[in-house]
Amino acid sequence: QATGITEINVRDAIATYEMSLVTPSRFDRYLGGDRNALTAAEREGLTEFVNAGCTACHTGINIGGTMYQKMGLVQNYFQRRGTPLTDADNGRFNVTHAESDRHFFKVPTLRNVALTAPYFHDGAAATLDEAVRTMALVQLGRTLEPAQVQRIVTFLNALTGEIPAGARMPPNEGTPAAAPAAAPAAAPAAAQ
């Protein structure tokens, strides 16, 4: 018998929804001790991911999602992108209005990252390869060789999990389009 909106029903609905978000991957089996859950190439990619410094931000069971970081920690991401700044580029500043939060964004989880292109808050990276190269450069100050990028991408693909039966994928509305290749002539952005 339905009882309407109650604290218990809301709690149960949220718990049921959160259970649908769990998408176990082969990486979880690997973490659980199944050494063969990842291929040799995926294990090499994991090693490359760690050695490149990606785990400085992408940590924990969700491989990210636990902290905020400045976009362009080592190299100015926005200058490199080459398009005018937008309000969205201000990141956490838009919420806190603290200057120290300008250009800070929540580090995303990398689970199912192969399914979530385009990448970054502005959709500027169309592929995982491009996202890995850009992050290595602007966040870590590293230029990765193509083989290193490919190894990391191979590992990232292993983070794709199984979508639970009955789960519905969210609508694709609101996904940012890739940033324009050239800056429009009107309204130059203020330097940050």
Per-segment meaning from a language model:
Residues 1-192:
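Periplasmic c-type cytochrome electron-transfer domains
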